[in-house]
UniProtKB/Swiss-Prot annotation:
Residues 60-77, 137-153 are extracellular. Disulfide bonds: none annotated. InterPro entries: CASP_dom, CASPL-5. Residues 1-38, 99-115, 175-181 are cytoplasmic. The keyword DNA damage does not apply. The lineage of its organism: Eukaryota, Viridiplantae, Streptophyta, Embryophyta, Tracheophyta. This is CASP-like protein 5A1. Belongs to the Casparian strip membrane proteins (CASP) family.
Amino acid sequence: MFASRPVVHPLEVAAPAHPVQQPAPGVLMKDLPGMPGTPGGLGLRVLQLLFAAISLAVMSSTADFASVSAFCYLITTTVLQCVWSLTVAIVDIYALLVKRCLQNRRAVTLFSIGDGITWLVSFSGACAAAGIPVLIDADLIMCSENPCASFQTAVAMGFMCCFSLLPSFLLNFYSIASSHG
C-alpha cells in the first residue's frame, strides 16, 4: 500500500523576546458586564439597593403592614437585600477605584452563594406578600379600608429587586461553572 508521508520543513522564525507576555490561547471572558468589580456589576447592585429601599420605604409607610406576617416577611427580606447589595456595592466601588480584579474563585463563589440566598429569600418574600393585596382586593373587597396601592407598589418593587438580582447570580454561577472546565 502506498501511503504518503508528510514532510516537515522547518521555518526560520525568531522566537519572541518575552514569551511570558504572550496571551493565553483562546478567548478569555473574565470581565463580563455584571460581574463583581465591573461597572455593570456596580450598576446592578445600585438597582437592587434602589428597588429594595423603595419597597421597604413604601411598605413601612403604611400603618397596617405589621398586622400581616407576609408583609413583615417582605420588610425583613428587603432589609436583608439592602444590606447585601450595599455591602457588595461598596466592595465593587473599592475594586473599581483601586483597579482590583474580583474574579478569583473564592470571591465569585461567595458572591454567587450570597446572591442565590438573597434572591431566594427576596423572591419568596415578594411572592408571599403578593397574595395579600389580591386577597384584600378581589376576595374581601376591602381596598377602600386598606392602602392596596401601597401594598401593590411595595410588592412590585420587591419583584423588581429580585429580577435585578437574578443577572448577578446567574453571571457569578456561570463563572464558577465555567472555571471547573
